[in-house]
């Protein structure tokens, strides 16, 4: 998924799409293609369940390829590492908080709500990119006017 997402973004840029359009297209495509993984909750075949989960994981990594480049796209070389450190720490902290919730959901209900929550968090993250980063562009091209 990561290779395909990076390749797709590069091809879109090479074809004349803006950095903003190519990154957001890859982010949205990945976010949307995670959702069909929910089908694994409704089928009995373990093979199809594995196929759907694999497709959702592929889509996750497809999306991540564009997300991983955002600090490099938006910040100077000097600041990009710090931004990644902060986002990595925030992600680890979020995982730490969410782990007991997952355990509780699985113990009291099932894996179903976990799959639903995780699927729609991808849509939420794409929406947050749209909201908080209206235009993805290289640091050297940011206008201050």
Regions found by a protein language model. Give the residues of each.
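Conserved short cytoplasmic inter-helical helices of the MFS fold
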Residues: 47, 78-82, 113
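Interfacial helix-cap and linker-helix signal at transmembrane-aqueous boundaries
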Residues: 8-9, 13, 102-110
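Transmembrane alpha-helices of Major Facilitator/SLC transporters
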Residues: 1-13, 30
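Alpha-helical transmembrane segments of multi-pass secondary-active solute transporters
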Residues: 26, 83, 105, 114-118
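C-terminal transmembrane helical hairpin of 12-TM major facilitator-type secondary transporters
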Residues: 20-67
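A late C-terminal transmembrane helix in Major Facilitator Superfamily
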Residues: 2, 72-108
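Multi-pass alpha-helical transporter architecture, strongest
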Residues: 35-43, 118-145
């Amino acid at each position: 998924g990561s290779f395909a997402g990076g390749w797709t973004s590069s091809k879109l840029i090479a074809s004349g799409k803006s950095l903003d359009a190519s990154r957001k297209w890859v982010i949205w495509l990945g976010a949307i293609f995670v959702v069909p993984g929910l089908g694994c909750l409704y089928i009995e075949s373990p093979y199809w369940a594995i196929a759907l989960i694999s497709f959702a994981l592929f889509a996750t990594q497809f999306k991540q390829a564009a997300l991983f480049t955002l600090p490099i796209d938006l910040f100077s070389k000097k600041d990009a590492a710090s931004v990644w450190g902060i986002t990595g720490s925030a992600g680890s902290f979020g995982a730490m908080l969410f782990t007991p919730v997952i355990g509780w959901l699985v113990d009291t209900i099932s894996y179903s709500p976990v799959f639903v929550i995780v699927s729609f968090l991808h849509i939420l993250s794409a929406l947050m990119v749209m909201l908080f980063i209206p235009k993805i562009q290289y640091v050297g091209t940011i206008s201050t006017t």
